[in-house]
Regions:
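RNA substrate-binding interface of SAM-dependent RNA methyltransferases
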Residues: 36, 40-132
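Short basic, glycine-rich beta-strand/loop surfaces that mediate nucleic-acid
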Residues: 32-34, 96, 143-148
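Short beta->alpha connector loops at strand-helix junctions that form conserved
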Residues: 15-17, 55, 81-82, 104, ...
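Structured adenosyl-cofactor binding patch, chiefly the S-adenosyl-L-methionine
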Residues: 35, 69-73, 84-100, 157-196
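Active-site/ligand-binding-proximal alpha/beta "capping" segment
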Residues: 125-175
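Arg/Lys-rich RNA-binding interfaces used to dock onto structured RNA substrates
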Residues: 1-60
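A short acidic, often aromatic-flanked loop/helix-cap motif at beta-alpha or helix-coil junctions
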Residues: 18-24, 111-115, 132-133, 174-175
């Protein structure tokens, strides 16, 4: 019953069939209303010194975990580019554990990302398993942005070519690569340890 859910002035109310409500809500049994809101425009902080960039990270749990870790370790912003998981999917929101509402997060195209970093005077380093990559402990990551790639493919060749340098997390010989959230956490810890 629509009268059971009073709305603020100016809010429109519609009745949807059960199939549409099931599509719009991840809950098995909806408590009633489903709503949409306009998200506020994200403004990045000034100064911008420590940025984590995720490119094509498709697992929403990893995206949420990176946002939560970035908030815990004092990163200025997280930027999502490429085909990253939906920032507001239920799994991303759960994994972020509330940090999504405290941590500046921006979603943008790669060219916009590069313009933003250039305008703020930040170098961009790409985490990569290449011969050109330097031990992250030997690279000054403050101020800087560090890009972490997708779980299966890493950073795209296009973004890697735009990086000012490449870094690698030193690991034991024969160890498998880390997943995106763990790699980002190690990088953020190093930034927090050395540059804040």
């Amino acid at each position: 019953d629509a009268a059971a859910f009073p709305l603020p002035d100016g809010a429109a109310q519609y009745t949807a069939d059960a199939e549409l409500v099931a599509y719009a809500s991840p809950l098995m049994h909806s408590p009633g209303p489903v709503f949409t809101v306009r998200l506020p425009e994200m403004r990045l902080p000034q100064p911008l010194r420590h940025v984590i960039v995720l490119e094509g990270v498709q697992d929403p749990g990893n995206v949420g975990t990176v946002i939560r870790t970035a908030n815990a370790l004092g990163m200025d912003a997280v930027v999502l580019t490429g085909a990253c998981a939906d920032l507001y999917s239920p799994k991303t929101v759960r994994a972020a554990m509330g940090a999504l509402f405290r941590q500046p997060v921006l979603t943008c195209a790669t060219d916009e990302l590069l313009q933003l970093l250039h305008a703020r005077g930040l170098k961009l380093y790409g985490a990569a398993l290449t011969d050109a990559a330097q031990d992250l402990r030997r690279v000054p990551l403050s101020p800087a942005a560090v890009a972490i790639g997708s779980e299966g493919r890493g950073l795209s060749a296009q973004l890697l070519a735009q990086c000012d340098g490449q870094i690698i997390i030193p690991m034991q010989p024969g160890a498998e690569s880390l997943n995106a959230a763990v790699a980002a956490a190690v990088v953020m810890w190093e930034i927090a340890r050395t540059g804040m």
